[in-house]
């Protein structure tokens, strides 16, 4: 849906396996819209990171 279309990631790390396993390691006040496994640290502002893994990276947030 739209969540996946609007999801973006600036720092995506992938393994060298085939297919690759990729994870977005951006840290922000919230996780991207398509994130299922979001972990936030209680700080001000909160620091959230998505722990989903995919075979691809989302497009960059800041072109």
UniProtKB/Swiss-Prot annotation:
<keyword id="KW-1015">Disulfide bond</keyword>
<feature type="disulfide bond">
    <location>
        <begin position="35"/>
        <end position="50"/>
    </location>
</feature>
<protein>
    <recommendedName>
        <fullName>Bowman-Birk type proteinase inhibitor</fullName>
    </recommendedName>
</protein>
<feature type="disulfide bond">
    <location>
        <begin position="8"/>
        <end position="61"/>
    </location>
</feature>
<dbReference type="GO" id="GO:0005576">
    <property type="term" value="C:extracellular region"/>
</dbReference>
<feature type="disulfide bond">
    <location>
        <begin position="12"/>
        <end position="57"/>
    </location>
</feature>
<keyword id="KW-0646">Protease inhibitor</keyword>
<feature type="disulfide bond">
    <location>
        <begin position="14"/>
        <end position="22"/>
    </location>
</feature>
<dbReference type="InterPro" id="IPR035995">
    <property type="entry name" value="Bowman-Birk_prot_inh"/>
</dbReference>
<comment type="function">
    <text>This inhibitor has two domains, each with separate antiprotease activity. Inhibits bovine trypsin and chymotrypsin, in a molar ratio of 1:1. The trypsin inhibition of FBI is independent of chymotrypsin inhibition, but the chymotrypsin inhibition is not completely independent of trypsin inhibition.</text>
</comment>
<dbReference type="InterPro" id="IPR000877">
    <property type="entry name" value="Prot_inh_BBI"/>
</dbReference>
<feature type="disulfide bond">
    <location>
        <begin position="31"/>
        <end position="38"/>
    </location>
</feature>
<dbReference type="Pfam" id="PF00228">
    <property type="entry name" value="Bowman-Birk_leg"/>
</dbReference>
<comment type="similarity">
    <text>Belongs to the Bowman-Birk serine protease inhibitor family.</text>
</comment>
<feature type="disulfide bond">
    <location>
        <begin position="9"/>
        <end position="24"/>
    </location>
</feature>
<feature type="disulfide bond">
    <location>
        <begin position="40"/>
        <end position="48"/>
    </location>
</feature>
<feature type="site" description="Reactive bond for chymotrypsin">
    <location>
        <begin position="42"/>
        <end position="43"/>
    </location>
</feature>
<keyword id="KW-0722">Serine protease inhibitor</keyword>
<feature type="site" description="Reactive bond for trypsin">
    <location>
        <begin position="16"/>
        <end position="17"/>
    </location>
</feature>
<dbReference type="GO" id="GO:0004867">
    <property type="term" value="F:serine-type endopeptidase inhibitor activity"/>
</dbReference>
């Amino acid at each position: 849906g739209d969540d996946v279309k609007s999801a973006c990631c600036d720092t995506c790390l992938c393994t060298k396996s085939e297919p690759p396993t990729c994870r977005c390691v951006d840290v922000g006040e919230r996780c991207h819209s398509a994130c299922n496994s979001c972990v936030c640290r209680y700080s001000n502002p909160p620091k959230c990171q998505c722990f989903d893994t995919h075979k691809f990276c989302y497009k960059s947030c800041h072109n």
